[in-house]
């Protein structure tokens, strides 16, 4: 009987632990002191890229120090809706994309010129709301990275401000610098370095096997409510180049409609935060674990 009671208790605990995360629950609010409008200069030259440290080079460019925040994206939507650059399509925001060249490769899908999904407003994970007139951000997420945004939505944001998504090589150089480190901050990873699966940060809800994003620049050496972060900037001063959210990159490869992401996320294991790890999805894909940052030519 005791064994039966214990089994019931264990089953109840497991069922409770599998309950879905309440995406609308209040979240901790911390001030990081990091300005999301800051850009970093990346010099021209060679660097090591990939798992096997191959040599590549880039021209000089600039890249955002943080991911685009939800507040920044809401500001973009308000401006773009006012001037007709985007439009509502039911519970979705769509915008024009000029299309890709189609090569007819097996499994390649056509991406034609037209209106494509930027963000879904009707998805439960969306942190931006629309009252019929104005886009606003769900309270507490203003300085978190913009998520649940498609590749088209990331591309459209950057294009609107005369910038672009970084290439994979540009992203990796900004994350790694010119040495052979596997992580933006060095050779090893600890829980205080980044937001990843089971990192035990203040935004993680392990009781339901879920987690939330952290504000951009959160891992800067500060202590937040007893949680000690480690200054985890890349050699060029970029934050969150590992963990928190995957980041869309701008490459459009011949014969392939998939787009690539870098950096790992709050939902990936620590080893998937290594600089050379890649992920890919269709350009209409969106997720609470995917965001982006912009780059621009000097």
Protein language model regions, located:
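Bacterial N-terminal signal peptides that target proteins for export
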Residues: 1-6
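C-terminal motif of bacterial Sec signal peptides marking the signal peptidase cleavage site
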Residues: 16-17
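Primarily auto-inhibitory N-terminal propeptides
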Residues: 25-29
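GGW-centered surface loops in extracellular recognition modules
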Residues: 30-41
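Short, solvent-exposed loop/turn elements at domain surfaces
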Residues: 47-55, 70-75, 83-86, 226, ...
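Active-site microenvironments of metalloenzymes and redox enzymes
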Residues: 60-185, 202
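Functional-site microenvironments in short loops/helix caps that host divalent-cation chemistry
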Residues: 129-279, 288
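Short, structured beta-strand segments at or near domain termini in extracellular proteins/domains
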Residues: 288-298
């Amino acid at each position: 009987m005791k064994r039966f009671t214990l089994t019931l208790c264990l089953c109840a605990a497991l069922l409770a632990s599998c309950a879905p995360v309440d995406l609308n629950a209040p979240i901790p609010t911390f001030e990081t002191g990091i300005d999301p409008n800051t850009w970093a200069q990346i010099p021209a030259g060679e660097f090591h890229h990939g798992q096997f440290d191959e040599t590549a080079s880039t021209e000089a460019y600039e890249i955002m120090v943080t991911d685009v925040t939800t507040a920044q994206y809401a500001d973009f939507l308000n401006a773009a809706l006012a001037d007709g650059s985007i439009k509502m399509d039911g519970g979705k925001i769509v915008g024009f994309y000029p299309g890709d060249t189609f090569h007819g490769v097996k499994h390649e899908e056509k991406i034609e010129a037209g209106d494509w999904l930027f963000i879904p407003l009707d998805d439960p994970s969306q942190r931006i709301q629309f009252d019929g007139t104005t886009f606003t951000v769900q309270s507490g997420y203003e300085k978190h990275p913009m998520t649940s945004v498609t590749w088209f939505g990331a591309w459209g944001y950057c294009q609107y401000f005369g910038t672009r998504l970084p290439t994979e090589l540009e992203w990796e150089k900004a994350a790694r610098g010119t040495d052979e480190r596997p992580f933006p901050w060095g050779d090893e990873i600890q829980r205080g370095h980044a937001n990843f699966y089971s990192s035990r940060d203040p935004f993680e809800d392990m009781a339901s096997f879920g987690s939330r994003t952290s504000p951009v620049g959160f891992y800067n050496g500060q202590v937040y409510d007893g949680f000690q972060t480690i200054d985890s900037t890349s050699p060029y001063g970029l934050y969150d180049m590992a963990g928190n959210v995957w980041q869309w990159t701008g490459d459009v490869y011949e014969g392939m409609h998939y787009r690539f992401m870098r950096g790992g996320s709050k939902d990936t294991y620590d080893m998937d935060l290594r600089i050379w790890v890649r992920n890919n999805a269709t350009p209409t894909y969106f997720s609470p674990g995917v965001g982006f940052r912009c780059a621009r030519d000097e």
